[in-house]
């Protein structure tokens, strides 16, 4: 770690809060400060206070939050790949009743003793926000992601998970983890953070890509009183007879019913007859219904308001690009991918400072713009 610029560039030194006559602290002083920050929650507390201040001043009035993750490499040296021992060949045939009971018992014990983030996502629903934040793995690990060409890209490092207001583009919640953590396993901590720590009365929608298509995430969003706008990830599911690819009912001739409205009181989607049914000879024979109603609680993954496939659903889903823009800003302008520290604890300090400075910059710009508008008026 070098501080030659602080000594050589007076303007930079003044911008950093030093006077010309001040001595620049030593490298070890900065190292001790980073260590102290890594062992406390002070940066998390400051980030939260800043967001609450932005809400108080009226700069955050979003109705939609977009959630996504971005990866960045560690400064630590990547370990050599360990060869996994060959698994013992499985015995042919069915297990006896006693063997199966013993196997089920062993599996239950194994799952019970797993770390929280190695369990199923649904197990996070009843866990407190404090424990979710405390138990997250933060050591650098190998991560993998498919690129635009469908090929696997590997990196050794971390992931930053963000929940961003789609219109204000403030980072409402951030979450730091090892590079091998499944994106979906960070969604519930982010959602609980928004629900429990922030007051956003206009918030209605949570939008995410197909990597977050897990039933537990839909349940968490539903518990918050919001709607999930999440791309559907078809997992070897057979086609449902009588419904189209967006799970809207179809008529006798397989034309899709049109989404009409949502009844908030009864949590019901209303679908009306397809336009093709106007001239259909079966329309007046009592074979096809004029109206279909579907409760979203029948299947939270498939039914949301507005309904999947509708113009309104697509327009809300487009807002998800806000979090991708913020991820790009953090890497291009705020040094997110220029990690200067080893170990996960110290890198989390880097991540927290980056997200804090981004939000602080947003708040400063919003205040300046408000002053300029007031002066013009």
Language model regions located:
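Basic, amphipathic alpha-helical segments enriched in Lys/Arg and hydrophobic/aromatic residues
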Residues: 308-377
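Polybasic low-complexity intrinsically disordered regions
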Residues: 4-7, 17, 25-223, 227, ...
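Short, charged amphipathic recognition helices of the HTH superfamily
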Residues: 1-8, 324
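Helix-centered, glycine/charged polyanion-binding patches within enzymatic domains
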Residues: 219-328
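Short secondary-structure capping/turn micro-motifs that flank functional sites
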Residues: 70, 237-238, 347
């Amino acid at each position: 770690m070098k501080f030659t610029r602080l000594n050589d560039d007076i303007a930079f030194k003044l911008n950093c809060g030093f006077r010309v006559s001040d001595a620049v602290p030593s490298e070890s002083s900065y190292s001790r400060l980073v260590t102290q920050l890594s062992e406390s929650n002070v940066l998390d507390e400051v980030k939260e206070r800043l967001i609450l201040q932005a809400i108080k001043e009226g700069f955050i009035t979003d109705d939609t939050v977009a959630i996504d993750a971005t990866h960045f490499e560690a400064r630590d040296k990547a370990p050599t790949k360990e060869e996994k021992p060959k698994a013992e060949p499985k015995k042919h045939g069915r297990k006896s009743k006693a063997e199966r009971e013993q196997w089920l018992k062993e599996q239950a014990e194994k799952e019970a003793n797993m770390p929280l983030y190695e369990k199923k996502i649904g197990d996070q629903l009843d866990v407190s926000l404090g424990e979710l934040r405390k138990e997250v793995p933060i050591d650098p690990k190998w991560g993998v992601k498919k690129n635009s060409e469908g090929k696997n890209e590997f990196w050794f490092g971390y992931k930053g998970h963000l929940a961003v207001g789609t219109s204000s583009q403030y980072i409402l919640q951030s979450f730091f983890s090892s590079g091998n953590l499944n994106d979906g396993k960070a969604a519930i901590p982010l959602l609980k953070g928004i629900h429990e720590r922030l007051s956003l009365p206009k918030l209605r929608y949570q939008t995410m890509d197909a990597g977050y298509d897990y039933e537990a995430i839909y349940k968490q969003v539903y518990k918050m009183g919001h709607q999930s706008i999440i791309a559907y990830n078809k997992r070897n599911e057979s086609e449902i007879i009588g419904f189209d690819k967006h799970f809207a009912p179809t008529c006798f001739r397989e034309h899709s019913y049109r989404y009409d409205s949502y009844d908030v009181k009864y949590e019901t989607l209303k679908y009306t007859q397809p336009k093709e049914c106007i001239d259909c000879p079966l329309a007046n024979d009592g074979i096809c219904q004029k109206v279909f109603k579907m409760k979203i609680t029948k299947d939270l993954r498939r039914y949301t308001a507005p309904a999947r496939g509708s113009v309104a659903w697509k327009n809300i889903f487009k807002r998800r690009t806000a979090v991708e823009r913020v991820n790009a800003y953090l890497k291009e302008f705020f040094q997110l991918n220029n990690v200067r520290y080893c170990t996960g604890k110290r890198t989390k300090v880097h991540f927290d400072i980056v997200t804090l400075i981004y939000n602080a910059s947003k708040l400063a710009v919003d205040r300046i713009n408000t002053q300029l508008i007031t002066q013009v008026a």
